[in-house]
Amino acid sequence: YSNDEGILSIMYHRFNENKYPSTNIKMEIFREHIDIIRKSNFDFHNPNNFDEQFNKPKQKKEILITIDDAFESFYTEAWPYLKENKIPFILFVSTEPVGKRGYMTWEQIKEVEGNEFANIGHHSHTHEYLIDVSNEEFILDIETANKIFLRELGYIPNLFSYPFGEYSKFMKDYI
């Protein structure tokens, strides 16, 4: 397709949760997004091949689907559709809210993670605005999440999404 080595990425959060319009998408519109992606001849980038394929020239246009925060609405609304269609994605999980009202449980996360087209990513422990915390607080947050990921999944995810998309050089170097 081109010598461009990049991959387009689309991030989603909530599905069919009209109470949160800034982070919500209706499933009807989400399905339309997927249809447009397919009709535009994009391949869905499988996150399981992320490290080995990311910086290589692409034969076709590729797009990466990411889901932030592991809201329960992802599991009840989008997950059945993604699973049925085997659409690759990364689910970025903040460990602190897991199991709380409105969030997925570890059992649900493990179910999702058990599919070859799904990948669990690291999204910190508290989902704080990390740019406002000290380096020590940042390290504690990440290490707390790492321990929980090890306990619950048996590994620490190798893909990281910064909450709110902001970070410092220290944070980037630490991750």
What are these regions (language model features)?
Residues 1-63:
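N-terminal pre-catalytic segment of deacetylase/amide-hydrolase enzymes
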Residues 78:
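Acidic, polar ligand-binding/catalytic clefts
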Residues 26, 81-84:
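Glycine-rich, phosphate-binding/catalytic loops in enzymes
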Residues 171-175:
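Short, intrinsically disordered, charge-balanced linker/junction segments flanking boundaries
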